[in-house]
Each structure stands twice: as C-alpha cells, then as structure tokens.
Amino acid sequence: MCQLLGMNCNVPTDICFSFAGFRARGGLTDHHRDGWGIAFFEGRGVRIFLDPAPSAHSPVAELVRDYPIRSLNVIAHIRKATQGDIRLENTHPFQRELWGRYWIFAHNGNLKDFAPQRSGRFLPVGCTDSELAFCHILDTLATRFPEGAPEPAA
C-alpha cells in the first residue's frame, strides 16, 4: 500500500521536518519506490511537485525537504504501484479544476474491478484506479450540482 502525509493548519506552516522522514520511506526506510508527489495549497492556487523516481533519491524531493514552503493544507503521497506503470502520469496526487477551484486527490489502496462509466468532462490521463476514481467523483459532483458548488449547511 502507498504512504500518505497530510497537514492542515490554522496558520501557514512548512512541512520540512515531517517531509524529511516521509521522504525516506520512499526507498530508504521502506519499500515504496514507485514515485511520489506533494501538493501545497496557496490561496486559490496549488503548488504541486511530482516525480516517478523514489522519493529517497529524488533531487526534487530534496528541494521540497529543504525549501520551507508555507501552506495551510498539504497532501503528500509515496506510491507503491498496484495498477498502472511507474510513470509521471500515474504519480499522485492528481489535480483537476471544478467550479473555479483546484481539487487534489491522493489514494491508498487498490480498487479491484472498479470500472465506472467513462462519461463527462473528467477523464484520466494515466491508467491508475485512483485517478479513475477521482475523475468519477468529480463527474458525479458536476452532474449532481450543475449550477456550481453547493452552499455549506448552516
């Protein structure tokens, strides 16, 4: 199974300390060698880094470990491939836009025999079950709420 790291803060914070240990799990202290990615939410934007190389040996992961990017929300993923080749397009987290907002998705697990109808505006670029599930979720939301994001409940 994959490894996930998330951070949610009330003030912008860097993830350098936590990411240092997490990065090592991608081929050094654990066997998750099939790519990695991390997404930092910054205002309405998302800064995302992806690499199909093991995170423990990735110069990009080293940069992320050493560069204090401050964010309120961070999602990181280290991949152990179960479906889809080790390629950039199969590396999590995945990003799409819906209702003028970026959505990020990372998944741990294997969705055997998951084959939803591929219709709608969200189509996978790679060939993982995770990206297919993400596209299906977004298609379902867009169909259910065609006028835009629902208002939060009071």
Which residues make up each language-model segment?
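Conserved beta-strand-loop-short alpha-helix elements that form
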Residues: 2, 103-113
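Short coil/turn connectors at secondary-structure junctions
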Residues: 70-71, 99-101
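Short acidic (Asp/Glu) patches
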Residues: 52-64, 78-100, 117-120
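Extreme N-terminus nucleophile/cap motif
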Residues: 1-59, 74
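Residue-level signal for inorganic ion chemistry
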Residues: 38, 109, 133
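Short helix/loop capping segments that flank catalytic or ligand/cofactor-binding pockets
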Residues: 15-16, 48, 84-86, 113-116
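Short histidine
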Residues: 112-154
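Fold-independent oxyanion-binding glycine-rich loops
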Residues: 7-10, 77-80, 107-108
